[in-house]
Amino acid sequence: MKRSLVITLNLLTWTLLAVYLSFSLRYTSQRKKEQLCREVRVTVLDSAERNFITPAMVRAWFAAEKMKLVGTELSSINTLELERFVRRRGFVRTARVYTSMDGRLNVELTQRRPVVRFNTQNGYNFYVTDDGYVLPQQRYFVVYGPVVTGYVPFPFKPDYVGPLDRFAGNPEKKVQKNYSFLVKLINFVKFVDSDDFWKAFIVQVHVVGSQAGDGYDPDIEIVPRAGDQVIMLGSVDGYEQKLAKLLSFYRHAVAYEGWNCCSYINLKYKDQIVCIE
């Protein structure tokens, strides 16, 4: 008798619990379906490292497209489409958009990191990021790193924005040659950016000899942050060995002759350094 009563009570308890859970889930689902968006919360996850994008800018993107989000039912907001919309902005590396039970539409994103700025004589002014994306110059943003000047042969027009590798394997010989040189030049600047000494030392990379014949890349010069020296690196090929040669020169010759021993240093030729006072 007691055992039968216990079983009955257990069944009744589980039945009531199932009814409660079913009602609760239906109520929660209906409530979520009818819940309105009360806030768009934008979080730039790497804002401490760089500030190309602010929450206000993201909200302005939505406003410019006349997206009425606040006051709209959360269930009717296409979060995947919003993610695609945010990712299409050049400075955005990753984006995640989702809703929460507190009535918020959450936008979380990270930014691309520019590693080099081009400001050339032939009218180009843009950034290249660490993941190989070409971005336009931004008025109020500062990138701490070498600026590339001179006359640089590019595989694209001055207003291009997008991935650099779009030009890889281009069948047009001139485009492919310019792309190959640009990649080598960017890799050189990345190397400088990754080395504490050279990053502090080199402030400008100047491209010269852009009229080099077929099969030859332009020469490059580097300008130190301090002093009046100009250093001819020559071809960008073999830059690690050339910089090692320059460092050895500074450690030995400059130690005896002084920093201003020469105004022009030429590293272009193998196994020698040519200096002009």
At which residue positions do the language-model features occur?
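Charged, solvent-exposed interaction patches on well-folded alpha/beta domains
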Residues: 1-44, 64-73, 77-88, 93-277
